[in-house]
Amino acid sequence: MPAKLGYWKIRGLQQPVRLLLEYLGEEYEEHLYGRDDREKWFGDKFNMGLDLPNLPYYIDDKCKLTQSVAIMRYIADKHGMLGTTPEERARISMIEGAAMDLRMGFVRVCYNPKFEEVKGDYLKELPTTLKMWSNFLGDRHYLTGSPVSHVDFMVYEALDCIRYLAPQCLEDFPKLKEFKSRIEDLPKIKAYMESEKFIKWPLNSWIASFGGGDAAPA
């Protein structure tokens, strides 16, 4: 039975989950809530048997989960992506946390009502953050070496969203630029991005100051 996902009809926190499932070739069905579906979600929220009801959610024949990182870890664990030693598992957990920091730094700016005032400071600090990630990646193809793992999709999605705000941000970081292209060139990811299922925009909720409109910046 295909897993069931639920989220808003945006990229948001669910996009890395979608990318991971597509890469793994796992079948899933997704319920997408639109801009005007808040009442629909509130009607569903406490009637699905979720322990901690929220979006995104993931339901399969063995468990019902919310919280995007928990969902990612569960799927990754089923496919042996969480490491085989305490040291490997700790390192992967560290990357997960840093990946969420990367994304949430972007998100905080995007949802700030004073977006135009605060984005300058964010963009000023961005090269330092990207340099850290470039140094961490080093000469590896993927963040944990090889093959690709769930954390690669977390970092990829953050980088892809950030480039809408700073289109040239990766030009000084060729290793990150190559990493991003490497993810996009994975056959199943490439096919997904060319399909009708792929959500290119919006990046964030419709209430966001940036990344939440009906159309991407020109």
From Swiss-Prot:
<keyword id="KW-0963">Cytoplasm</keyword>
<comment type="function">
    <text>GST isoenzymes appear to play a central role in the parasite detoxification system. Other functions are also suspected including a role in increasing the solubility of haematin in the parasite gut.</text>
</comment>
<feature type="binding site">
    <location>
        <begin position="41"/>
        <end position="45"/>
    </location>
    <ligand>
        <name>glutathione</name>
    </ligand>
</feature>
<dbReference type="GO" id="GO:0004364">
    <property type="term" value="F:glutathione transferase activity"/>
</dbReference>
<feature type="binding site">
    <location>
        <begin position="54"/>
        <end position="55"/>
    </location>
    <ligand>
        <name>glutathione</name>
    </ligand>
</feature>
<dbReference type="InterPro" id="IPR010987">
    <property type="entry name" value="Glutathione-S-Trfase_C-like"/>
</dbReference>
<dbReference type="InterPro" id="IPR004046">
    <property type="entry name" value="GST_C"/>
</dbReference>
<feature type="domain" description="GST N-terminal">
    <location>
        <begin position="2"/>
        <end position="83"/>
    </location>
</feature>
<dbReference type="InterPro" id="IPR036249">
    <property type="entry name" value="Thioredoxin-like_sf"/>
</dbReference>
<comment type="similarity">
    <text>Belongs to the GST superfamily. Mu family.</text>
</comment>
<keyword id="KW-0808">Transferase</keyword>
<comment type="function">
    <text>Conjugation of reduced glutathione to a wide number of exogenous and endogenous hydrophobic electrophiles.</text>
</comment>
<feature type="binding site">
    <location>
        <begin position="7"/>
        <end position="8"/>
    </location>
    <ligand>
        <name>glutathione</name>
    </ligand>
</feature>
<feature type="domain" description="GST C-terminal">
    <location>
        <begin position="85"/>
        <end position="203"/>
    </location>
</feature>
<dbReference type="GO" id="GO:0005737">
    <property type="term" value="C:cytoplasm"/>
</dbReference>
<dbReference type="Pfam" id="PF14497">
    <property type="entry name" value="GST_C_3"/>
</dbReference>
<feature type="binding site">
    <location>
        <begin position="67"/>
        <end position="68"/>
    </location>
    <ligand>
        <name>glutathione</name>
    </ligand>
</feature>
<protein>
    <recommendedName>
        <fullName>Glutathione S-transferase class-mu 26 kDa isozyme 51</fullName>
        <ecNumber>2.5.1.18</ecNumber>
    </recommendedName>
</protein>
<comment type="subunit">
    <text>Homodimer.</text>
</comment>
<feature type="binding site">
    <location>
        <position position="111"/>
    </location>
    <ligand>
        <name>substrate</name>
    </ligand>
</feature>
<dbReference type="InterPro" id="IPR036282">
    <property type="entry name" value="Glutathione-S-Trfase_C_sf"/>
</dbReference>
<dbReference type="InterPro" id="IPR040079">
    <property type="entry name" value="Glutathione_S-Trfase"/>
</dbReference>
<dbReference type="InterPro" id="IPR004045">
    <property type="entry name" value="Glutathione_S-Trfase_N"/>
</dbReference>
<dbReference type="Pfam" id="PF02798">
    <property type="entry name" value="GST_N"/>
</dbReference>
<dbReference type="GO" id="GO:0006749">
    <property type="term" value="P:glutathione metabolic process"/>
</dbReference>
<dbReference type="InterPro" id="IPR050213">
    <property type="entry name" value="GST_superfamily"/>
</dbReference>
